[in-house]
């Protein structure tokens, strides 16, 4: 026997918002810019896409928390292995040598070799490394990490460069607005009566019918003087 609530839900015109329907919201087509459309990742959100492309989704200051980058276990292991390989390369030691050696002085500090029983796979012995890593080596590792981050940022920089070139190529030339004959006569009448005294000019009820401010009148008179070569 179905409950009353379930029967009402079945008759309702509002369908349940399932994950299958929700994911369709991300499947959008970018029509505004071909470069952004080409580099858009539909599996990411708008904010994540903008950050990956080196752009900002909002021009204002950040209010609230910032989404932290969560690394997967595979990424952490790969990063740790790459760091270890670089350290071993600087110490002239290979990973294969560490996997075979029982000398703690040939294993870096923070690493260990686990020796297991080949039949039962039980841990028989754990050899902890005692090989110290020099400060210069740590600096080299940090430099290598910075170089990796720079390489990752080059993709975003190339997109920004493409966008700048596209904007410069498709920028519209702004046409300067010219004053009409009637507007020129009006500016001339104001200038002949008040000169450069824009504060008195704005209180003239007959000439300044629309009560334009002193700053607006100054811009218009300056433009009229420039068009008529008046200093």
Curated annotation (Swiss-Prot):
One GO-annotated biological process of the protein: rRNA processing
Gene from which the chain derives: NOP16
Stated name of the protein: Nucleolar protein 16
Main location: nucleus
Acidic residues bias (residue ranges): 136-150
UniProt keyword annotation of Ribonucleoprotein present: yes
Source organism (scientific name): Lodderomyces elongisporus (strain ATCC 11503 / CBS 2605 / JCM 1781 / NBRC 1676 / NRRL YB-4239) (Yeast)
Compartments in which it is found: Nucleus, Nucleolus
Alphabetical UniProt keywords: Nucleus, Ribonucleoprotein, Ribosome biogenesis, rRNA processing
């Amino acid at each position: 026997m179905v409950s009353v609530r379930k029967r009402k839900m079945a008759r309702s015109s509002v369908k349940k918002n399932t994950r299958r329907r929700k994911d369709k919201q991300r499947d959008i087509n970018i029509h505004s810019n071909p470069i952004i459309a080409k580099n858009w990742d539909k599996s990411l959100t708008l904010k994540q896409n903008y950050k990956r492309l080196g752009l900002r989704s909002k021009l204002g200051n950040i209010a609230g928390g910032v989404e932290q980058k969560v690394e997967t276990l595979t990424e952490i292991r790969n990063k740790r292995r790459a760091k270890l390989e670089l350290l071993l390369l600087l110490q002239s030691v290979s990973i294969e040598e560490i996997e075979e050696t029982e000398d703690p002085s040939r294993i870096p500090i923070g690493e260990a070799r686990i020796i297991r029983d080949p039949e039962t796979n039980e841990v028989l012995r754990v050899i902890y490394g005692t090989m110290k890593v020099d400060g210069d080596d740590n600096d080299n590792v940090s430099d290598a990490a910075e170089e990796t981050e720079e390489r990752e940022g080059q993709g975003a920089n190339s997109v920004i460069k493409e966008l700048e070139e596209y904007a410069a190529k498709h920028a519209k030339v702004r046409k300067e607005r010219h004053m009409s004959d009637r507007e020129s006569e009006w500016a001339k009448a104001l200038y002949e009566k008040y000169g450069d005294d824009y504060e008195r000019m704005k209180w003239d009820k007959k000439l300044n019918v629309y009560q334009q401010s002193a700053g607006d009148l100054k811009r218009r008179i300056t433009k009229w003087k420039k068009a008529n070569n008046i200093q």
